[in-house]
Amino acid sequence: EINQLYRTLLQDVPGIAFHTNPNEDFDSNYWLTCIVVNADVTGFTREEVRLRMEQENIETRPLWKPMHLQPVFADCPYYGDNTEGRLFDDGLCLPSGPALTNEDIARVATIIKEMY
């Protein structure tokens, strides 16, 4: 319900993409709503969105930092194409708690839209 409302409110916002199921074999419960901010399209970065939300006393966070980028794993081999690095750089977890109201979600969406 939370995820769907975010998707509805931000569906026409250029440069904001939501994580989706890759195909019908997957069925996410969307316990956490995450977006990817394409700064080339939006004109602002994920970090700018996070800081703007912080100014409004709204907690968001980047997607999880990839294991191979954490200091404890600095000397470990890495096999990949940096997709996870791009998601960490551009991805943001939006407020998704069960106590959120529709008005709370609308406020988050409005703040993102006002950044344009």
Where are these regions (language model features)?
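PLP-dependent aminotransferase class I/II
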Residues: E1-Y116
